[in-house]
Amino acid sequence: MIKSTGALLLFAALSAGQAMASDVAFRGNLLDRPCHVSGDSLNKHVVFKTRASRDFWYPPGRSPTESFVIRLENCHATAVGKIVTLTFKGTEEALPGHLKVTGVNSGRLAIALLDTDGSSLLKPGASHNKGQGEKVTGNSLELPFGAYVVATPEALRTKSVVPGDYEATATFELTYR
């Protein structure tokens, strides 16, 4: 009985109402994503060990390198043989090729990214492996990077790095060719 009452009410509402037009929008996005970024590589956090601010008053004015890996997995068979390049993007510090930090040391500290060779500076906007990328040879691929904190030349000169939190954000983009 409840079902038929509901049906009657619906019918009454439809027959008593005026005709009304409404749009339905459909949207999508198709990707050629030969490999998936592993879950542990999405929204990655690289945490630098706590250091005294005075460590950034004298040359070389930098922290030890923290390593991190971007993992690609479930690479489709059509990806094998393709070259993948990874490019980090973010707000740059005045110190060329470094990421700008926020916090009390903005303009005094910067983040340097190291390329997959572990020693070459990877500038924001540049592709990894000196622009050459990596060949996808199987179902997965690991891209090892490093990062360190460095005092800007002005902060070294004036010994102006102070205690406090800092952070920087970079996004990465994968391109297949």
UniProtKB/Swiss-Prot annotation:
Domain of life (superkingdom): Bacteria
Compartment(s) of residence: Fimbrium
Signal sequence, start to end: 1-21
GO annotation, cellular component aspect: pilus
Keyword Oxidoreductase: no
Record carries keyword Transcription regulation: no
GO biological process: cell adhesion involved in single-species biofilm formation
UniProtKB keywords: Fimbrium, Signal
Gene3D superfamilies: Fimbrial-type adhesion domain (2.60.40.1090)
Record InterPro entries: Adhesion_dom_fimbrial, Adhesion_dom_fimbrial_sf, Adhesion_dom_sf, Bact_Fimbrial_Adh_Pro
PANTHER family with a match to the protein in the record: FIMBRIAL SUBUNIT, FIMBRIAL SUBUNIT ELFA-RELATED
The protein, known as: Protein PrsK
